[in-house]
């Protein structure tokens, strides 16, 4: 018998696992607003237990001071977590993806894609996707800055840029800059015959 699984709108875990996400308070608020019946089923005992525990703590004067301190610590921890998430999002939005086309020998090219490690994209899977999508050789290697980059053999610059745009849109990052660099080998200027 199949059971329908409800996923949390805050942490994207199944609602039974929200406590492991570190965002339990916000998850509870979301669940109460969107699925009140499930909220009552999962957290009604917890709320009753918390109420009785706080009543017991309120009876002792040491418990009140301790509870206030714990609440302040919890509040600080939550604000730190929110600030960290905002910094990570700002870092993702401010970073850019660089797609560089380089000429090899004769009429052969490679396309090197760097800057994707910030977006939590599995580079090996992406390389495999490019290899099958463009029917070319593709690998993951370290560039001069010791960062991973995907190297695609062939002149597929436009297709790669379009695919990366769609990939970032799926992740909700369509504001990220995708910079293309086209480096072509310069031809040697022909020597002009010396004037006699």
Swiss-Prot record:
SUPFAM superfamilies named among the record's database cross-references: eIF1-like
GO MF annotation list: mRNA binding; translation initiation factor activity
SUI1 domain ranges (all copies): 97-168
Matches recorded under Pfam families: DENR_N, SUI1
Domain notes: The SUI1 domain may be involved in RNA binding.
Family, similarity comment: Belongs to the DENR family.
This protein's name: Translation machinery-associated protein 22
Native species: Candida glabrata (strain ATCC 2001 / BCRC 20586 / JCM 3761 / NBRC 0622 / NRRL Y-65 / CBS 138)
